[in-house]
Amino acid sequence: MKTIGILTSGGDAPGMNAAIRAVVRTGIYYGLKVKGIMRGYAGLVEDEVIDLNLSSVGDILQKGGTILRTARCEEFKKKEVRKKAYETLQKHGIEGLVVIGGDGSFRGAQLLSEEWNVNTIGIPGTIDNDIPCTDYTIGFDTACNTVIDAINKIRDTATSHERANIIEVMGRNAGYIALYAGLAGGAEMIILPEVEWSIDELCDKITYGIKRGKLHHIIVLAEGVMSAPELAKMIKERLPKLDLRYTILGHIQRGGAPTVMDRVLASQMGARAVELLLENKTKRIISIRNNQIVDDDIDEALSMKKEFNRKLYELSKILSI
């Protein structure tokens, strides 16, 4: 193998640049040429390929986002479009492709491997932490720290004004950001897709807190359950005198300098991706499980089901009495 390519696909996540850096520097260390594909699969289809060298990845370790940029590519579901992507790989002599992204990105890599025998390696990069085969994804820790910073600041003003605050965080189908940030931020209630909840239980908890002299109430809501305005309306219907505000954190969760954990994880995964290609292993997704870097067959990895950490959720309820 002489030349490898790398792309970032789907939603961006802090730490993607650290992974790109690791792939490029490890590849060069082993004597490989490294090509960058701009704008994910869309750029692969449209032949947006650049050369990457040591200078290309200098001073990016600490930066959020992705220097290769990213884009959605619905057209990639069509085989004739994927053929164009394969032709781009052939044109540039790319023998192995590293894909950084989430579930949809890996399914694209899976199809390239199945249809055109492309050597592919997946690196999980998404703030949602919803990839079944790995304990943590690149970007998750940074996103949680961003949310915690917001919770801390909102609590300051909530205490001053004796208010309740709803903080809506990302997570359409997975509530890991809500769970981890809610637990670490001391939320009175965490509302997420994986667990049933009761509006009456929430309002009873707020009422009890007021009676015992509590000055603030923090409710962390995953966006996939409902919107913050909808939840606020439900609460106000039951507690009309409650001073209630809501904050939708939105895309602030995707930006910012990656944490130490995300930088280290991305560096490990990026380096391992190159090593797997040099070992002639393909159709693999790299993961971290039990603090060890491992890899799985892409078909098996995509068929896994992520087990929700019920113990952490129960702990959050115990600690929020």
UniProtKB/Swiss-Prot annotation:
Allosterically activated by ADP and other diphosphonucleosides, and allosterically inhibited by phosphoenolpyruvate. ATP binds at G11, R72, C73, G102, D103, G104, S105. It comes from the Bacteria. Its main location: cytoplasm. The active site is at D128. It is found in: Cytoplasm. Substrate binds at T126, I127, D128, R163, M170, G171, R172, E223, R245, H251, I252, Q253, R254. Homotetramer. HAMAP family: Phosphofructokinase_I_B1. This is ATP-dependent 6-phosphofructokinase.
